[in-house]
A protein has these predicted regions:
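Sequence-specific dsDNA recognition surfaces
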Residues: 2-36
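Short, solvent-exposed loop/turn positions at domain surfaces
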Residues: 23-24, 101, 144-147
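Short, charged beta-turn/beta-strand-edge "cap" motif at the junction between a beta-strand
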Residues: 41-46
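Short, compositionally biased
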Residues: 48-64
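Short amphipathic beta-strand starts and helix->beta connectors
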Residues: 53-54, 97-101
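A short glycine-rich beta-alpha junction/loop motif
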Residues: 59-67, 76-79, 99-123
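Glycine- and charge-enriched low-complexity intrinsically disordered segments
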Residues: 72-74, 78-89
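Amphipathic alpha-helical coiled-coil/heptad-repeat segments
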Residues: 92, 114-169
Length: 169
């Protein structure tokens, strides 16, 4: 599964395992609420460090170069950390740990363990999550409006060109 910002991309073929030892499943089976963050990409391009939270996806195993963060949900809500780990300030810090050769960039687990995070109480986390989701919903709506307008502009452009080359202008 490809981890993208706030979602998973299931469009590529997945590696399937028919059988797995119980010890493997215990260690690598993803659970609802796990936050995944990608640790490898192109050096200097920030094309990794993407965060998504496991929801209703079942029977997926953690892959190499992806970290899974699991929280005691009586203290820390995964949704809160999904948004925190995607924030510009965290991403700047995260990429400060980047190593690797000319082409490939890597960030190790130290980037996830070193930072000191001020953790608000659960009610405050819930309010922050709600506020972020409300604002992201507005962004999604604007993005949909822009996409629709671009499609309409392209259709109009094609119509104008058709009319021009059929002598109707």
């Amino acid at each position: 599964v490809n981890v993208k910002e706030r979602h998973f991309d299931f469009s590529r073929d997945l590696t399937k395992t028919l059988e797995a030892d119980d010890s493997i499943l215990e260690k690598y089976l993803l659970r609802r609420g796990d936050c995944l963050i990608t640790l490898t990409g192109s050096r200097g391009k920030r094309d990794y460090g993407f965060v998504a939270m496991v929801g209703n996806q079942n029977n997926y195993l953690l892959n190499q170069r992806v970290a899974a963060l699991r929280f005691d949900q009586s203290v820390a809500l995964p949704e809160f950390f999904q948004y925190y780990l995607a924030s510009p300030s965290y991403r700047d810090m995260f990429f400060g740990y980047e190593t690797g050769n000319v082409g490939q960039g890597n960030v190790g687990i130290k980037a996830l363990l070193d930072p000191y995070v001020i953790l608000p109480d659960i009610d405050t986390q819930k309010r922050i999550i709600e506020d972020v989701e409300d604002r992201l919903s507005v962004c999604d709506s604007i993005e949909q409006t822009v996409d629709t307008a671009l499609q309409q502009a392209e259709a109009m452009r094609q119509s104008i060109l058709k009319d021009a080359f059929e002598g109707r202008l």
